[in-house]
């Protein structure tokens, strides 16, 4: 009588099954890519722009996605081929998102601000058309209504990126969205601090910026991406303070401590940074209670004048003992260097 017990699959069968799985995966990937290309092509017509036009910007989270064993890079290829946007041309921008997030692609015509945003929903792609002109998106009413759109808060990620590009701000600023996920007022404050340091305290031969990110908030991602002052290189340490500790700091609006350090001589200079968001709100045309994207966009014109918001509240010498101690867990860096109330 024939034995129906499970038997080990023959090598030929295994190869056939693996090949079948690959064919199904490839077919699905090609199908998704082709559908996206079709939606992009229609979107370009909607916003009245030709592929590879200097008026066209494409923003997407595609490189960071990995869904059902499909890399988001297949979508990047579809975008490049259909829209003609490329990294080298400066009109293809990315922003970080979780690998399981839905695909987002924004097509933006800077001539008049008309935009189509494509969002993946299951196996389908849905699109919405917006007027994202500078005048429109800098009105609080636009953001009051944003929750009624399919995209919701995604607009707060996409709009500042599009407007930064349209205004010609430095490419390095827009790259921050690839680490931070958006261009919020906090990461923009970090950008201003970086520009201030480079302008007022440029590094000498062999020197490094060491960041003591206390208190830590969005700003600190700018130090990591733009200065290379990362935690992995031991050039950034981050910590928070209790409310009681904050009250005792003598630095107004504390934004962390930067050490200009020379590892060869083991000496450096400490800079206690101050960043006042009240000063930021004063330059927002629509008022201090404006939505965050408007606050961010109001700062673009100040990128060459970081000193308007960034100050050095105190300077101090740093020797090797202080350098080691200030980076230890549990140490209040302000107390260590005498910047707290007696």
Kindly give the residue locations of the regions a language model identified.
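Bacterial N-terminal signal peptides
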Residues: 18-26
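Non-transmembrane, aqueous-exposed alpha-helical and coiled segments at domain scale
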Residues: 30-183, 192-342
């Amino acid at each position: 009588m024939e034995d129906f017990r499970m038997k080990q699959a023959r090598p030929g069968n295994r190869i056939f099954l693996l090949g079948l799985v690959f064919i199904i995966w490839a077919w699905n990937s090609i199908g998704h890519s082709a559908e996206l290309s079709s939606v992009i092509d229609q979107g370009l017509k909607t916003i009245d722009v030709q592929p590879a036009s200097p008026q066209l910007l494409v923003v997407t989270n595609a490189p960071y996605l990995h869904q059902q064993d499909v890399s988001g890079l297949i979508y990047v290829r579809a975008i490049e081929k259909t829209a003609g946007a490329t990294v080298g041309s400066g009109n293809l921008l990315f922003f970080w998102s979780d690998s399981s997030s839905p695909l987002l692609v924004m097509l933006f015509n800077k001539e008049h601000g008309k935009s189509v945003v494509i969002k993946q929903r299951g196996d389908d792609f849905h699109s919405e058309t917006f007027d994202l002109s500078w005048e429109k998106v800098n009105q609080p009413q636009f953001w009051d209504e944003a929750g009624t759109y399919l995209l919701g808060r995604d607009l707060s990620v996409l709009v500042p990126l599009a407007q930064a590009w349209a205004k010609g701000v430095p490419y390095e600023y827009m790259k921050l969205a690839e680490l931070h996920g958006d261009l919020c007022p906090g990461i923009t404050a970090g950008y201003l601090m970086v520009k201030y340091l480079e302008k007022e305290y440029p590094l000498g031969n062999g020197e490094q910026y060491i960041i003591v990110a206390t208190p830590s908030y969005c700003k600190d991602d700018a130090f990591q991406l733009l200065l290379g002052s990362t935690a992995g290189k031991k050039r950034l340490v981050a910590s928070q303070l209790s409310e009681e500790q904050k009250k005792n700091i003598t630095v107004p609006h504390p934004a962390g401590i930067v050490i200009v350090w020379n590892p060869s001589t083991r000496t450096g200079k400490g800079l206690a940074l101050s960043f006042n968001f009240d000063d930021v709100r004063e330059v927002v045309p629509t008022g201090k209670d404006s939505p965050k994207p408007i606050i961010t966009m109001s700062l673009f014109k100040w990128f060459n004048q970081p000193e308007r918001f960034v100050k050095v509240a105190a300077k101090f010498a740093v020797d090797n003992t202080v350098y080691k101690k200030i980076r230890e867990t549990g140490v209040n860096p302000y107390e260590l260097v005498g910047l707290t109330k007696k």
